[in-house]
């Protein structure tokens, strides 16, 4: 049975998932997604209530007259979940939409918007835009997601209490941005890049390299990103990075004994060496 599209068309946004689109498309046509799904089951088109069943995805593509690429963003990349999140409200013209965008960090460069909650304007904060370009070029290009372990460690290190409240206050006064995570995004991305840099990883996680030498390297590289100034506490960031690299070193050591290391979130960092 060939499905005819619903009368009123609805644009699908890049990365948008089927739940988000079906809600908007059904509402625009004065019904609910559940009503449409029920009708599809009554006509024998759907045989399951599974939201992500291929037949349901294809049905909603037909109902919206969408391309075959709609709803095909992978759910997982290298065993890591691609998290669904709110899309840029400027990209969606104010509509609420959700989806997966593995190639994006936390900034919509087109509209210069912070994609956290709430979304805020970043026109006055150029370092965050630079950080997003670096994320896409150096991290996303190697399948490092916006909420992957390197970025989570980066966020821990970019804590306002570590960077220093004086520096954060200066950025807030200069940009009128109140979200601390938007203000510290540049440091977050830099730490994540450090933790995925092959030359750094190769040395700091090498069991054969003296521990003092490895710790000195970690300290020096972290303090390039978060300098010891005013009320900053870069040693706390160093401790976080050192803890992570210690786990990685242990996995490399175990791999020499047992073969392939444990496949976990730390393993996904080791693959970058």
Located regions from the model:
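Basic, alpha-helical nucleic-acid-binding regions used in initiation and control of genome expression
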Residues: 1-273
């Amino acid at each position: 049975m060939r499905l005819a599209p619903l009368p009123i068309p609805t644009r699908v946004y890049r990365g948008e998932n089927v739940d988000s689109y079906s809600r908007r498309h059904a509402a625009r046509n004065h019904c609910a997604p559940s009503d449409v799904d029920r009708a599809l089951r009554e006509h024998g088109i759907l045989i399951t209530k599974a939201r992500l069943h291929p037949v349901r995805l294809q049905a909603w593509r037909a109902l919206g007259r969408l391309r075959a690429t709609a709803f095909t963003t992978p759910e997982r990349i290298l065993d890591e979940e691609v998290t669904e999140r709110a899309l840029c409200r400027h990209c969606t013209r104010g509509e609420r939409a959700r989806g997966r965008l593995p190639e994006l960090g936390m900034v919509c460069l087109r509209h210069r918007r912070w994609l956290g909650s709430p979304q805020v304007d970043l026109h006055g904060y150029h370092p965050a835009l630079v950080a997003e370009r670096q994320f896409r070029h150096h991290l996303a290009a190697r399948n490092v997601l916006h909420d992957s372990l390197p970025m989570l460690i980066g966020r821990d290190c970019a804590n306002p209490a570590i960077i220093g409240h004086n520096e954060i206050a200066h950025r807030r006064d200069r940009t009128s941005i109140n979200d601390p995570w938007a203000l510290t995004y540049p440091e977050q991305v830099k730490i994540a890049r450090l933790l995925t840099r092959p030359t750094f990883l190769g040395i700091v996680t090498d069991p054969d390299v003296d521990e003092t030498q490895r710790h000195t390297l970690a300290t020096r590289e972290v303090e390039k990103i978060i300098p010891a100034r005013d009320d900053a506490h870069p040693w706390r960031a160093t401790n976080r990075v050192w803890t992570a690299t210690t786990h990685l070193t242990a996995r490399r050591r175990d791999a020499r004994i047992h073969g392939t290391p444990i496949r976990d979130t730390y393993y996904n960092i080791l693959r970058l060496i």
